[in-house]
Design a protein with these regions (language model features):
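Intrinsically disordered, low-complexity proline/glycine-rich segments
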Residues: 1-160
């Protein structure tokens, strides 16, 4: 993923481990709320991402086929500032913690590692990778929640 992933109105390709274009993060400009679509290489929308407008805490919503898939928000009462809670539509909770702004964090389910996000500084472009650990994990969901937690962390930093 490119480091400038989260510019509204910007589009960014996500490449697989072979360097092939696999997903497109399509930033939607001129919207009342921060909005993206994650598309496959053929242009089909896999998930939609938007900021919830009227929430007490900053919240991002991930939808698939118009139905809520997950909500993402900073974890309450956490000693760690960079700790986010993802609640899936079925009530399952995922935990994201680490150095979000440094692009160094992990996604866990019930203490089991699902994915690791880390910087890759040895490339020509400033990029970071999402290493999906579990074979049965949903890549589109993990990419979408990565977009969400980085956006929320950057927004929180701007508001300080």
């Amino acid at each position: 993923m490119y480091d400038r992933l989260l510019g509204i109105g910007d589009d960014h390709w996500i490449e697989d481990d072979r360097g092939d274009k696999a997903f497109l993060v399509d930033g939607k400009a001129l919207r009342l709320r921060d909005t993206w679509e994650l598309k496959d290489a053929q242009g089909r929308v896999l998930v939609g991402i938007h900021r919830k407008m009227f929430a007490l805490r900053d919240t991002m919503v991930i939808e698939r086929a118009g139905e809520p898939l997950a909500t993402v928000r900073r974890k309450r009462l956490s000693l760690l500032r960079n700790h986010y809670l993802i609640t899936l539509a079925d009530g399952t909770e995922l935990d994201v913690s680490g150095k979000i702004l440094d692009r160094e964090f992990a996604v866990e389910y019930d203490g089991e590692l699902l994915a690791v996000v880390s910087r890759r500084l040895l490339t020509v472009r400033d990029t970071y990778g999402i290493d999906i650990v579990r074979e049965d994990a949903d890549p589109a969901l993990l990419i979408a929640l990565t977009v969400c937690v980085i956006h929320l962390a950057e927004k929180e930093r701007e508001d300080e």
